[in-house]
């Protein structure tokens, strides 16, 4: 049998001796296992000896038990069986191994599935036995095929981090091979017939594990180099030949890993091996340059794809079994790329990671998808991406690492800084964003967007407004913004828009309907109303005449639209403004009786038709109400042109009607009036102008059969351009007085319905007539809260409209006082007078301690806090006491508290503790407790009580004697001159109504009413109400008022004590805020 094997054609002749084989064994041990000794490692040598002792019968049995043989043969070949009994020495002479991986293909080897040997031995036997069988059969057939076909037909799965590791390993191996004499032969082991046989090869020999790694590296390198054409590969591989057919290298890896996993999971079961091919481990070339080139190509592909995100290998199904194909000269068509092997099988083929190294996945997605998210150690928030985690940690650290180079602005995020830098860009270009409806200007477009929300009730097509749906929780009001309503009537042109706005069954449905409504569309809601109060309607249903019960205030929610007037006029003034607008919108006198709708009647129906600028509200009954067809709700084209003339005034009227809900709120859980009251028409033939049917909860519901009467020809419509021009809300005085004249001309009011009017001092009597809605403050409710627009529950029920004129006799003061300069409206004449002083250039309120001058008294009061004094007006009172302390009841305290920092003194412990909290920490201990009977001073309250109990028991408080300590002559002179001046001018100060009295802001100080009390109380400051007991303390206090140098801001004329404070203060004027210019409002 050995003779017959020798007669076989030798494919790879050997030219080395047995001694070189032993050296090759040593080289294998040194290169792969890292042994530095000259003897082979014990593991490799023992394994070789064990494989040599394998019996011939066992090997024959292993080869014959496989159901398939190499190259698709179903029965074992006789030549294959004879190969098992071949002697080891003959095999060493007939085989050789080269340093490069052959790209040739052989079928999957036969192996015993039931073998219980270690996984490494089975894997080597699986690889090498199959390659030898294919070599023998293919050589017998005599068919040779160029390996370029393999390279051209290979198709691989996408590269993973495993493939990248293999490519790096292949590159390292190639570099070592070149260093160890690339073209000189050396010894290594090869696997044959179940034994490891040393043979001649290069110095860099391959073990089965290294062969697997190189196989994977070569396969992935070919995959990554997709840009190479077939001709280039032909030139590269044309000098090599292979007798095997071409298949996919990835299919090889899939089959190999599946085989290994089956052997490792179920070693006792037999599994028919798939017939798919895998790359042969038989070396076919003697050049290490090709391996180096493949590794270099793989490294170049990795660098090219470094920036792209590499997907992780998916879990594929096991490779499908297909019939083996015989080797033929023409290359078969390239098969579809098979799925890559499972990750668990692929892990078996990987080289173990050396100690000290950690293999990290190359793509960021693999780390995020591997179930290892980032968790915040402070709040426990789990974040998927590391960049998001870093940005989240700024919340806890508070680190603002981004600094604006032009101003002190700092932020934590780069995008916020980028948005901030746009402000400086607009400032450098001189760009500002101007509101088209008011004088508002801003350097940021976003600030203009926020500002435009104020004008959403006066929406214009040319103004870019960020439209928002109003609060849908206001019950009884439409779920459509008035900006959308006006936007439709302006953008529509000749088109006519109409919608049916009905209240929903539940508050939940109401909120959903309001949230889903587009700003320019009308949403139809259910027609039943089972729980919500209906809107403001005009009904002809028969009801009790004296039905005046108000709605429960808990059913209403505060309207956010009142913020429009929050900076300009109060809500009460907005309500007064509303009443004049509503009166002007009346097309003809009507006999109305306003009542509060308590519960709608059955059979009450919707209004019939609407112009294009209006919407219908359907106050349905709480039980059931028949629906209304859409034909009855279509607009009338003939009435649309009438409303185009005064639609702006109606919009303002409806807005202010909504704002009037705020004017009746009671803060202390008292029933309030938040919505307009119901209107009941006594005469059913009275028709209402279409202009009343606008926008909010003031829409009037009428019967279907009621005809829509045209506007009288002799009636002058309201001003059309009243709100069409770009004016601010603060210029409402023009509208107010024009409408007041129209109201007074059109309606004749009796003295019972007219309340005495307080006219504005800035308008003549003939131009400004008395308004029927005005009232005197003396006729208001007795409670003082009514003066501020608050009405108690018993009085709110008395608010009704007088029948006969259709105008209400409201029980609160609604006279408005506008400013001629800026148009701002005030509710009191005193407030207007104080406001007018801001428009004058004269600064008549001057500080007597420094050069500061203010336009109004409030600003001077605020400024005087720097000097620890307060300015008090004596316009209406002869004597004003600025401070009324609890200790001013005449009680005599045995001791008092004195502050060493500012000289403040008080006898009450609570006031003194409150005062000392104003100082910094190091100054809070600079105080003393002084005895009123003597000069005893201490810092402990227990000591002063002991002192009083032992020394001054039963004694009355005495006037403290003057101290003998030296004093400053300048302070004494100032005190004497000030005291003498105050004695001479004391009576004049009390007589003059417009003079100023300077008193102390300290709550514990005793007020000084006249100059005669000073000798009894000791030393009293002429600049403030400070009184002290000793002269040295009085002189120390005077130093506060003798500040010779104050640092004044040249922009706002504010004084600072130190130049550092002034420098810090000036930064407020240099940093742009993007807000409203103070001079315009």
Swiss-Prot record:
Subunit structure as annotated in this protein's UniProt entry: Part of a transcription inhibitory ribonucleoprotein complex composed at least of the circular RNA circZNF827, HNRNPK and HNRNPL. Interacts with the nucleosome remodeling and histone deacetylase/NuRD complex. Interacts with RBBP4; the interaction is direct and recruits RBBP4, a component of the NuRD complex, to telomeres.
Zn finger limits (C2H2-type): 374-396, 402-424, 433-455, 817-839, 845-867, 897-919, 929-952, 1019-1041, 1047-1069
Family the entry assigns: Belongs to the krueppel C2H2-type zinc-finger protein family.
Organism: Macaca fascicularis
Renumbered residue ranges of the record's region Disordered: 1-77, 258-280, 305-348, 525-553, 616-640, 947-1013
Subcellular location, record wording: Nucleus; Chromosome, Telomere
Cross-link (Glycyl lysine isopeptide (Lys-Gly) (interchain with G-Cter in SUMO1)): 673
Species lineage: Eukaryota, Metazoa, Chordata, Craniata, Vertebrata
Region feature (Mediates direct interaction with RBBP4): 1-14
Biased composition (Pro residues): 327-344
Biased composition (Basic and acidic residues): 1-10, 631-640, 947-960, 979-988
Glycyl lysine isopeptide (Lys-Gly) (interchain with G-Cter in SUMO2) crosslink, residue number(s): 176, 216, 226, 360, 372, 466, 475, 523, 549, 580, 587, 597, 634, 639, 658, 673, 704, 710, 742, 778, 798, 870, 891, 958, 1014
CC terms in the record's Gene Ontology section: chromatin; chromosome, telomeric region; nucleus; ribonucleoprotein complex
Swiss-Prot/TrEMBL GO biological process terms: chromatin remodeling; establishment of protein localization to telomere; negative regulation of DNA-templated transcription; negative regulation of shelterin complex assembly; positive regulation of transcription by RNA polymerase II; telomere maintenance
Keywords: Chromosome, DNA-binding, Isopeptide bond, Metal-binding, Nucleus, Repeat, Telomere, Transcription, Transcription regulation, Ubl conjugation, Zinc, Zinc-finger
Residue ranges with Polar residues bias: 62-77, 616-627
Ranges of Low complexity composition bias in the record: 961-978
Function: As part of a ribonucleoprotein complex composed at least of HNRNPK, HNRNPL and the circular RNA circZNF827 that nucleates the complex on chromatin, may negatively regulate the transcription of genes involved in neuronal differentiation. Could also recruit the nucleosome remodeling and histone deacetylase/NuRD complex to telomeric regions of chromosomes to regulate chromatin remodeling as part of telomere maintenance.
The name this protein goes by in its record: Zinc finger protein 827
GO terms for MF: DNA binding; NuRD complex binding; zinc ion binding
